[in-house]
Curated annotation (Swiss-Prot):
Amino acids binding ATP: 65-69, 205, 217
Record family assignment: Belongs to the CDC6/cdc18 family.
Function: Involved in regulation of DNA replication.
Gene3D superfamilies xrefs: 1.10.8.60, P-loop containing nucleotide triphosphate hydrolases, Winged helix-like DNA-binding domain superfamily/Winged helix DNA-binding domain
Entry keywords, A to Z: ATP-binding, DNA replication, Nucleotide-binding
Gene, per the UniProt record: cdc6
Full protein name: ORC1-type DNA replication protein
PANTHER family tied to this protein: CELL DIVISION CONTROL PROTEIN 6 HOMOLOG, CELL DIVISION CONTROL PROTEIN 6-RELATED
Species of origin: Picrophilus torridus (strain ATCC 700027 / DSM 9790 / JCM 10055 / NBRC 100828 / KAW 2/3)
GO molecular function: ATP binding; ATP hydrolysis activity
InterPro entries: AAA+_ATPase, AAA_22, Cdc6_C, Cdc6_lid, ORC1/CDC6, Orc1/Cdc6_arc, P-loop_NTPase, WH-like_DNA-bd_sf
GO term, biological process aspect, one: DNA replication
Length: 408
C-alpha cells in the first residue's frame, strides 16, 4: 500500500511554521491590542517583586476577549522575573468547582508523584497540608480562577471565602476571570470585603483588531499569498459580530487552512471560511447534544418527534407524554413534570429549543416548544448507545389544545 501521508507533503509549499499558533490552547508571547490590560495587571502585581502583597484582580469581558491569555501571559512574565518566590496555580473552575477540589489540586502540585486522592480525606487535613507546604517554601501564592463565577453558582460565596482565607493565612492573591459583569454584586458582604479586587475590563475586539490578531498568528507560519486577504477580513468580521470573539475568528481560520491542506488547494478563499463557519457551528451543536444528560436527550427527542407530526410546534403536555413513552421503550423511570420543566428551561438556555408561552383560552396557558435544528439534533441523539434499540414511540397529540400556530 502506498503511504497515504505522501499526498499531504505538498503542504510544505505554503506551511513554513507550526500550526499550533492557531490552536485554542496556544498562548503567544505578545497579545496585540491587550497591552493596556497587561500593563494594568503588571502594575497591580508589581508589589510582589519587593516582598509586598498584591491586590486581588478581577478580569471582566466576553468570551474570546483575551482574558485568560492575558492572565497567563502576565503570570508567566512574573514567574520569569520573580523566580522561585512565586507559586502560580491556574484553576479552571469548570473542572475544579469546589474549594475541596481546588485545594487537593494545589497540594498535589507540590507533592509530585505520591498524589493524594480527590475524595476521602478531611478538608481540614488538606488545608493544613497546603498551608504547611506554602509556608515551608516561603512562597507567594497567586491563584488564577478562570470562570470564577462557576464557584459562585455552585457553592455560593463559601468556596471563594475559603480560598481567600488560605491566601490570608499564607501570602497571596487571586486573579478571577469572568464574563459575568454582575459577579461582584452576587457575593455576600463578608467575601466582597475580603476580596476587595481591582477590576480590569476587556472590551470586545473590533474587526480591525481581529484582523491584526489573525495576521500576527499566521506570520512566519503561512507563506504570503496562501490565504487571501478577503478570507482574513471575513474571519475578522465574523468574530467581530460574535461579540469580538478572537477565539472564534482564529478557529475559523484554522479549520479553513486545514481543509485546504487536506484537499491540496492552492489558497484559502472566502468560500473556505464560510465552509469553516458551518463546520464550526455544527461541531458546537454536536458537542452540546452529546454532553446532555440522558433525560435531557429524551426530552429533546420527544420534542422533535412531536414536532414532526404537529406543524413544527410541540406543546409541553405532548412532550411529557411522549417522553414517558420513550422512557418505557428505553427502560428508564420517567422524571416528574416539574423536573422535566427544569430540563426544558436548561435546553432553552442552551439555544437547543425556543419556548413561547401562549394562551389557550379556557384551557389556560401552555408553553409551545420548537427545536431549532431538529434533523441534525435527532441524529446526534440517536448516536447515543442508550438509544441503539429505539424504534420510535407512539406519538401523542393533544388535539383540543391545537389551534393555528402558523405564526410561530
Amino acid at each position: 500500500m502506498d503511504n497515504p501521508f505522501i499526498k499531504y507533503s505538498r503542504s510544505d509549499d505554503y506551511i513554513i511554521g507550526n500550526l499550533k499558533t492557531l490552536s485554542s490552547s496556544y498562548i503567544p508571547d505578545n497579545l496585540p491590542h491587550r497591552e493596556q490590560q497587561i500593563e494594568l495587571m503588571a502594575r497591580s502585581l508589581s508589589s510582589i517583586m519587593h516582598g509586598g502583597i498584591a491586590s486581588n484582580i478581577l478580569l471582566y469581558g466576553q468570551s474570546g476577549s483575551g482574558k485568560t491569555s492575558s492572565a497567563i501571559n502576565v503570570t508567566n512574565m512574573l514567574r520569569s522575573a520573580a523566580g522561585d518566590r512565586v507559586s502560580i496555580h491556574y484553576i479552571n473552575c469548570e473542572i475544579y468547582d469546589s474549594h475541596y477540589s481546588i485545594m487537593v489540586h494545589m497540594v498535589n502540585s507540590f507533592i509530585g508523584e505520591e498524589q493524594i486522592p480527590n475524595l476521602g480525606l478531611p478538608f481540614d487535613r488538606i488545608y493544613y497540608e497546603l498551608v504547611k507546604r506554602i509556608k515551608s517554601r516561603n512562597l507567594y501564592t497567586l491563584i488564577i480562577l478562570d470562570e470564577i463565577d462557576r464557584l459562585l453558582s455552585k457553592n455560593g460565596s463559601d468556596s471563594l471565602y475559603v480560598i481567600l482565607k488560605l491566601l490570608g493565612d499564607t501570602e497571596g492573591s487571586i486573579i478571577g476571570i469572568t464574563n459575568d459583569s454582575s459577579f461582584i454584586n452576587k457575593l455576600d458582604m463578608r467575601v466582597r470585603s475580603r476580596l476587595n479586587a481591582e477590576s480590569i475590563i476587556f472590551t470586545p475586539y473590533n474587526a480591525d483588531e481581529l484582523r491584526d490578531i489573525l495576521k500576527f498568528r499566521i506570520n512566519g507560519v503561512i507563506k504570503n499569498g496562501f490565504i487571501e486577504d478577503s478570507a482574513i477580513n471575513l474571519c475578522a468580521a465574523i468574530g467581530a459580530q460574535e461579540h469580538g470573539d478572537a477565539r472564534k475568528a482564529i478557529e475559523l481560520l484554522r479549520i479553513a487552512i486545514e481543509y485546504c491542506i487536506r484537499e491540496n488547494r492552492e489558497r484559502v478563499t472566502i468560500d473556505d471560511i464560510y465552509m469553516a463557519r458551518e463546520r464550526f457551528e455544527m461541531n458546537i451543536l454536536k458537542e452540546s447534544v452529546k454532553t446532555l444528560p440522558i433525560h435531557s436527550k429524551m426530552v429533546l427527542l420527544s420534542a422533535i418527534l412531536t414536532q414532526e407530526v404537529s406543524s413544527d410546534i410541540a406543546v409541553t403536555g405532548e412532550i411529557y407524554e411522549n417522553y414517558k413513552n420513550i422512557c418505557a421503550e428505553i427502560g428508564l423511570q420517567p422524571l416528574s413534570t416539574r423536573r422535566i420543566s427544569d430540563l426544558m428551561s436548561s435546553l432553552d438556555d442552551l439555544g437547543l429549543i425556543v419556548t413561547t408561552t401562549r394562551s389557550m383560552g379556557r384551557y389556560g396557558r401552555t408553553k409551545l416548544i420548537k427545536v431549532s435544528q431538529p434533523v441534525a439534533i435527532k441524529n446526534y441523539i440517536l448516536e447515543d448507545e442508550n438509544f441503539k434499540n429505539f424504534q420510535g414511540s407512539r406519538i401523542v397529540r393533544q388535539s383540543k389544545l391545537r389551534t393555528n400556530y402558523d405564526d410561530i
